[in-house]
C-alpha cells in the first residue's frame, strides 16, 4: 500500500445525493423559466457548485441569480436531503475497514457548502470518520475543478498530495484531484447510465482507476 492519506469527495462518493439535489434544482429552474431536461441539468451542474454556474443560469432564465434564490434552493434541497438521503451502497463497511489503517488521515473534500456536507454525513452516520477534517470548496479561493479544496485537505493532514489518494465520481472532481498532484480513482455506480461514455470521460480527466463497488475499495487500496 503506497498511500498515506485518503481524500473523499462527498456527493456521489459517500452519499447518493446527486439525484435528490438535481431534482430540486431542475424543479426550481423550471419555475424560473428554464425548461431544461433532467439530462441537461445533470450536464450543467454535476460536480459543480450552483453559484459557480451563475452565468449559465442567468443566460437561460434571463433573470439575475439572487442570494434570495440561492438561499431558497439550499433550504428546499436540504429538506429533500433530510427526507430522502441514503449512503452510497457498501460505504459503511468500506469506511469501517479503512479507518483502522488510516485513522485521522482521512478527509472529506467537497465542492458543496459546509452545512450541506455536514448535514449529509450526519444523516447517514459517516460524520465520525471525518470529524474535524471536512473541507468545503465554498470556503476556498476557487472551487472544483481547481485543486484548492484538495490542497487544503492534504495540508491539514500534513501529507504531500503525491501520497494522497482521491476518490471522486465526476470529471470536475477528478480534474481537481489531478491538479492537486494526487492519484485519483473514480467510483461509477454499477447502475450508472451511459456507463462506457462516463468511464471514458473520467479517464480522460485523469482517473487512474475506475471501480464500481465501495465493497472493493479497501482491497484495492491494500493491493496498490
Q: Model-flagged regions — what are they?
A:
Residues 14, 106, 166-167:
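Conserved SAM-binding loop
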